[in-house]
């Protein structure tokens, strides 16, 4: 029964794009024990994957802005102890950044990652015991799947399963069909204009499609409220 540690800390889209690789691992290595290191704000997403035994949260984003605090170094020391508390057969860093490679370096196990030409930050490859070439032009989902397959020794099959267990109920009444508008981003410069969301929502509403706008933080709630003034929009509760 192989023990596998996945290192993919952020951001939300990258974390979701890594889920099919984890499903592949579970399918090809039945009984494998899979743990996943992820940024604390995305831990709940990883916990939805049916094949992940343990979610190990980190706070790299918070730590970077507080390196002068003793509490930061205390948390880093606790993370290292946790990662070294049990051995892994494979440590797979599918992020390809120096920060993720350093996290993998803390763990006990054979460290796998992208080679210098494939990694997003070439220097990260120095921290791996085994380096794998994966074409950079592929979609992130396919790159993650190919890396895992190369590290664990199986062939990638067509198609992919995200393996996420979704809740069967929503906090509001939903009619079918519906569209889910994910309006939030990690940075303001990545936001799509609110007027564009309203325009798209109006076009979908004209076709009988209900638009749902989930939100988390207060500023996201306000943004969704402004967008939802267009016909056919509904705001769901916080996520």
Model-derived features: where do they sit?
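Catalytic machinery of carbohydrate-active enzymes
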Residues: 1-239
């Amino acid at each position: 029964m192989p023990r596998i540690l996945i290192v993919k800390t952020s951001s939300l889209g990258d974390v979701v794009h890594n889920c099919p690789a984890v499903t592949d691992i579970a399918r090809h290595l039945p009984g494998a024990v899979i743990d996943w290191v992820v940024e604390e704000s995305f831990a709940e997403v990883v916990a939805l994957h049916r094949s992940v035994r343990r979610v190990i949260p980190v706070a790299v984003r918070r730590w970077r802005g507080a390196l002068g605090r003793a509490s930061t170094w205390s948390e880093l020391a606790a993370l290292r102890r946790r990662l070294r508390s049990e051995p892994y057969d494979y440590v797979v860093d599918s992020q390809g950044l120096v920060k993720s490679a350093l996290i993998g370096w803390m763990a006990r196990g054979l460290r796998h990652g992208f080679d210098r030409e494939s990694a997003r930050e070439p220097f990260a490859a120095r921290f791996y015991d085994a380096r794998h070439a994966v074409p950079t032009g592929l979609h992130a989902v396919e790159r993650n799947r190919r890396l895992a397959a190369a590290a664990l020794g199986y062939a990638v099959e067509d198609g992919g399963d995200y393996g996420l267990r979704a809740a069967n109920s929503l906090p509001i009444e939903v009619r079918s069909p519906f569209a889910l508008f994910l309006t939030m981003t990690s940075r303001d410069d990545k936001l799509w204009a609110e007027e564009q969301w309203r325009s798209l929502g109006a076009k979908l509403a004209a076709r009988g499609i209900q638009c749902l706008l989930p939100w988390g933080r207060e500023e996201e709630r306000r943004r969704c409220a402004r967008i939802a003034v267009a016909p056919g929009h509904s705001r769901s509760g916080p996520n």
